[in-house]
């Protein structure tokens, strides 16, 4: 095959190597196997124990009689603050309903209303009810659990659980597979589905493994990355006294059903259903004005039966959401940037594909619309699986790389939160450029280059949005240089 392992190093071959066991990785592995490819799925954790598992919201799809893909697209473009790639938005919104239908056919049980139709929730930034969910706020668990069952039952997929990728098998000109702790896997196509990097910030809603490994692996192998200055901070994560790290997510759907944000005086201060960057900014302004570290989310207007796990989580933290509002503050939630790829997942490095949160197609622009991310996994996952399954071997042997991935330290997480958090400036970002973790440095460089405030990227030294940067993406190439690109 195209890969070449050194003496004494275990190696194997497959058609498609998928790195990541969340929703995107499971789906791509399943679809590629169904198209006749031999698939090896590498998962750092047991199947389905990923960030996708914890997704509370749902899938956004225009299914209601008064809704349409065009309306969904308008909401996505509005949330994206002038940076969405129109072709990606059109692809997602046009095929979202079909993705939901396929998941139902595969056995995912979504919540239904009293008439047996899909129950559609409302979330911030959406102009219509279009969020399909399962178990109230356990959508990720329902989807990844079912996909894991289907993958385990498919003989075309070899699953390597609790196995970490430490490098991509690349010579800088093409990717020939993946290197794991246990050995090297040669592949015609390698698909990164490693999730995002929001756990690189100290206060996060993500599991601690969400450290942006995909972007680091890809860039080290020779692929370009982009839009890394944009990390979405979810407005409503629990803010428990004395615990700066806790970022337990309280789903946006709570506000869609009537939960209210209150300041220190008990007054409402913002539109709870505005896009996330707008709500987060309002909360941060109010926290600063009130000289506190949180605001409150009043859950008393909604029924506990609709969100049993949310109310249980609050009670487990010593809170009584049925009697009094709970403390919340923003936490890092989703990185819009990642590995640059087209709508079929092809990166700038031949042989390497990316899908899900680790990918950067330009779909989300500067600010992701709520619940578009799970939909993205399936709409674009279908395209990526087809492209990867049909990929052809394209060259001779590739030597194993010497570079190996090293995770970030606790000091890096603290530095990223304090210097590239919801509020940032040149001084802090320049300090972060010296961090030992590659992704922290790339985030800082991209944020320094974008001399404006847009979406969740808010610089106190450049507080205004600059119209001349509409549609401009800051891309960091394999050689480390930063360039500006406009994507169509």
Model-inferred region functions:
Residues 3-14, 23, 31, 35-37, ...:
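Glycine- and aromatic-enriched mobile tails/lids
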Residues 12-14, 181-189, 348:
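Core beta-strand elements of the Rossmann-like FAD/NAD(P) dinucleotide-binding domain
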Residues 37-43, 227:
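Short beta-strand "acidic-cap" motif of Rossmann-like dinucleotide-binding folds
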Residues 45-77, 81, 245-246:
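Conserved N-terminal glycine-rich FAD pyrophosphate-binding loop of Rossmann-like flavoproteins
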Residues 47, 217, 223-326, 378, ...:
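An anion/pyrophosphate-binding glycine-rich loop and adjacent beta-alpha core
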Residues 84-97, 131-149, 160, 205-212, ...:
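Short beta-strand to alpha-helix junction loop
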Residues 104-181, 193, 237-241, 261:
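Conserved redox-cofactor binding core of oxidoreductases
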Residues 189, 193-198, 358:
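Glycine-/small-residue-rich beta->alpha transition segments that form the dinucleotide
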